Amino acid sequence: MPLSDFPLRASVAVSDIDRAVTFYEGTLRLPVVRSGPSARIAGGSRVYRSGGDEALHVYQSTTAGSSQATVATWYVEDLDQVVDELTANGVDFLHYDGLTHDARGITARAGGGRIAWFADPDGNTFALESDG
């Protein structure tokens, strides 16, 4: 069977699961599906639902925040609304040199559409994209 027959879930390392829970469940309002151990840390991982399915696995690790690339992207219909809601919840959107962002951090996406980036407390970068 090809891998395309199976769901894919992003996994993100964090340095402090309690701080991550505050961010992912409180600030981003992602519903937790389950929690469990991570390596030798009881309760050191969470799986969150997004888009109607298990989509994001967050786990405590010493490698947290080491990626400088976007680790996961949400594809949204109304980028302005989602950015405004997350900003109201305390999310700061990133601005990158060489790109023209509006005041909220939204910029044109290569190939069309628009995109905005933000980071979790460990510096893991996420994107929001829309075609409009």
Can you say where each PLM-predicted feature lies in the sequence?
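Short amphipathic alpha-helices within nucleic acid-binding modules
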Residues: 23, 79-85
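Vicinal oxygen chelate
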Residues: 1-3, 74, 83-132
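Conserved short beta-strand elements that form part of the metal-binding/catalytic scaffold
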Residues: 31-77, 94-95, 104, 125-130
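Amphipathic alpha-helical segments
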Residues: 19-31
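N-terminal beta-strand motif that seeds the catalytic metal site of vicinal oxygen chelate
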Residues: 1-19, 69-72, 129-132
